[in-house]
Amino acid sequence: MSFTSRSLLASFTGCLLYGTPAIADNGSEPVSPENGIVFPLQTDAVNSCEVPDKKSKEEEDQQPVLIQADSVEASNNSKAVYKGNVHIIKGRQEIKADSITLHQQENIAIAEGNVDYSSMEMRTTSDKVTTNLSTEDTTMVNTAYKMSCQPIRGQAGRVLKTGQEIYQLEDASFTTCPADDNSWRFKASDIELDQSDEWATFYNARFEVLDVPIFYLPYVTVPVGDTRKTGVLIPSIGLDSKNGFELSVPIYWNIAPNYDATTTINYMERRGTQLETEFRYLTELGKGTVDAEYLNEDDKFKDKGSRWGVSWDHSGIYQQHWKFDVEYSKVSDIDYFQDLNSSIGTRDEGQLQQSGEVSYRSQDWDMTMRVRDFQVLVEEQTPYRLMPQIEFNYYAPQFYSEFDFNLHSHISKFTTDDKAKPSATRVHLEPKLSLPLSGTWWSLIPETSLLYTYYQQDFDKQPVGPNGSLNLDHEVSRTIPEVRINGAIYLDSTHKFLGEYLQTLEPKIQYLYVPEVDQSNIYGGTGDGGYDSSKLQLDYYGLFRDRQYSGVDYIADANQFSVGATSRFYDDAYKERMNISFGQILYLNGSGTEQNNDDKNSSAWAMESDFNYDDYLFYHGGIQYDSNVSELQVANSTLEYRFSKGYIQANYRYVSKNYIESNVNFEDDLSLITQHGIYQAGLLSEYNLGRNWALKGQYFHDTKEDQMIEALVGVTYLSDCWSFGLTYSDQLIAPESAKTIGTYEPEYESNLMLSIAIRGLGNNTGITSGSANNALDYGRPFYLNN
């Protein structure tokens, strides 16, 4: 008897037992005796990851049992034994085996010998499989398994499938590595794989690397998807030259659909045990995160006592009109970020903001109430607290003909702990009238404003007035008009630059007039700081501002023209490939900067440029050159070459000491920070060595002092199921006592970081340590359109 004849006979017996044809012609798939049986349900559907809905499941339950085998033995219409290349499909279950016994009354199939079992969630090879074809309850013996929808595989002495999507594995292993790769795996007495919750739970588990046990856990859960579930996550291990051996055990809390938290127990060999908690929430008032860190006793710095940090970030919109924002951070001491790695901040933090805002926004107006304070992380600095500020803005576009009107106003209360500084209440009103005009190739916006400010200034212990220490008035009001006219032209060239680039020219001019008003009876009213004012950087885009200072404590007088132009170059696809902008302010009555008694006729030249050649060579540069004193004030330049395996970037930053002194208010001696200004060169690169290896390097150097600022080198290995990283870094640290730059030997903090991560277990889980991130890092300061 031929093979095809035996298969037909076995299938015919299945029809007698189950009353449904096992051979079917669906109208599009012809039955060919030479090719054997054609099943209506193909193997691709059996192996689908799609979870059937209730209706689909009911339809599958009504589908016939499709059987193919070399031979069959039937017994009393109650069971049949199929032998030789047995193949069964029922709904989304598929079984291939040397022999299968079908029990009609119980609807149970017992497969033995080289059993391949496939369902919607799992594919296995076993010695024996017993399955209920109706309920899909299944037992497998001596099984190698692979999940269909996740990169998970392993072996198990016994597999039990209960319900539709839950598997229980006994004496089992678990890994996300590809076949024949046991770089890492879990071995456990019991593993529960819940496909609906997308989590795996291990009991009496040990973690092995290259078959070597690393650690034992009596209980642990890991995600096999993105679904959240409470449980102990995979521990983190690392090696840090600052903290020694590190072990972190995270515990995830799925509190509610819109609340969760992760508590991490961090053991640091040289520091002690730290508790770290991240709480996340989502409500109708917005979303936010609360982070808290606590180290009861720092073994390395015992004199600093318990060390802690906390932060709260919130942002949300309520009923389309209300907006809430909170940014609050606080740490136990000013050296916290220097001594400890933290998720709250980095070692280059100079202060932590503590602010909150509540806003109501309508079509024509908005109102905001805000409070703001700072924790200063340097000694002997006491910034002002804003307690509180109420801001009101009104907008009336085209309120009369083509004229626009808007009103900006606020009332602010400033307090400070510095007894040498006044506290104050400030009221500011600023109505503005403008006439925006434009055509296809031009725009012109004349506008006029009136700035009215009232102050009530108080000293806690010193009188304010003509005899006060700062010669300030207790009450003072100031009214300053402002006129501003801004115009621009947009021109396209009819000839292509270099035969392939469309060039545009965009000249721009602005006239600004602000009369000179004596403001010396206001704290900060001479341009040397104030309650919330500081001088703004005068780059190209700053040439066309109407203010030299943030805040309103000092309004610099102005009678000036700002002139500039931008030229852009586009390729045939209208992608911007290059631009260059340059400009200058021409002063008619001096610069208005009372601080320097300036009587010069022009500002420094400002220029910005960006370049993109064929999407692999990028450049950005900017300079400010003061021709009045023949001094380069500010310069920055970045050149980056990108290729298929990585990039290399060189950058340089220069700021003259005179520019720093003129634009930044230092309460301390500037020589403690710099003797000559900023002369900083950097070189950064990443390179992929083949498919798995990557190298990373960073180096920053002070070219004036001829000393390294920071350096970092790292290597990373990335495979299909795990990654390894080793990073070494050196960072220049400030001296413990106040010393003038250049009078002491530089000191560096060295860190060696080891990181190991396993892949394929959801988005947020892995064995990993922290990274040796430096204060200076890679950036892409390229601003071309498209």
Curated annotation (Swiss-Prot):
Main location: membrane
Compartments where located: Cell outer membrane
Keywords: Cell outer membrane, Membrane, Signal
Keyword set includes Transport: no
Entry GO terms, CC: cell outer membrane; transporter complex
Coiled-coil regions, chain positions: none
Stated name of the protein: LPS-assembly protein LptD
Matching InterPro entries: LipoPS_assembly_LptD (IPR020889), LptD (IPR050218), LptD_C (IPR007543), OstA-like_N (IPR005653)
Signal peptide, first to last residue: 1-24
Domain of life from the UniProt record: Bacteria
Family: Belongs to the LptD family.
Protein role: Together with LptE, is involved in the assembly of lipopolysaccharide (LPS) at the surface of the outer membrane.
Pfam families recorded: LptD, LptD_N
